[in-house]
Amino acid sequence: MSLGIDMNVKESVLCIRLTGELDHHTAETLKQKVTQSLEKDDIRHIVLNLEDLSFMDSSGLGVILGRYKQIKQIGGEMVVCAISPAVKRLFDMSGLFKIIRFEQSEQQALLTLGVAS
């Protein structure tokens, strides 16, 4: 299975919705698309919706951590939302939720960043 990447900008927030599998085959594509958007759009924060992501490996964690560091460097924040149980377990084991905020829904994530959805 491949990775579907849907991105749009709401005010200064890049909303990323992933579907399918984020692994060593697809991680570089996500990295490039997000980096391009951060460079061309006026992005301050990232909301990462993982509701329809069925699988993720350590390559996916690495890409997410890298984008987290990128957005933190400009004083922004990353919020993960609507995560599937299997992927949530990976986040819990890796300790990423100690540094990246989690919200139940994309709407709630946007509200925490000061954007009305």
Curated annotation (Swiss-Prot):
Sequence ranges assigned to domain STAS in this UniProt record: 3-113
Alphabetized UniProt keyword annotations: Phosphoprotein, Sporulation
UniProt cross-references to InterPro entries, sorted A to Z: Anti-sigma_ant (IPR003658), Anti-sigma_F_ant (IPR014237), STAS_dom (IPR002645), STAS_dom_sf (IPR036513)
Family, as annotated: Belongs to the anti-sigma-factor antagonist family.
Modification after translation, per record: Phosphorylated by SpoIIAB on a serine residue.
GO biological processes: sporulation resulting in formation of a cellular spore
PANTHER family, alphabetized: ANTI-SIGMA FACTOR ANTAGONIST TM_1081-RELATED, ANTI-SIGMA FACTOR ANTAGONIST TM_1081-RELATED-RELATED
Chain positions with Phosphoserine modification: S58
The keyword Transcription regulation is annotated on this UniProt entry: no
Main function: In the phosphorylated form it could act as an anti-anti-sigma factor that counteracts SpoIIAB and thus releases sigma f from inhibition.
Record's protein name: Anti-sigma F factor antagonist
Molecular function terms from GO: anti-sigma factor antagonist activity; antisigma factor binding
The keyword Lipoprotein is assigned to this record: no
Entry-linked Gene3D superfamilies: STAS domain
NCBIfam families documented for this protein: ant_ant_sig, spore_II_AA
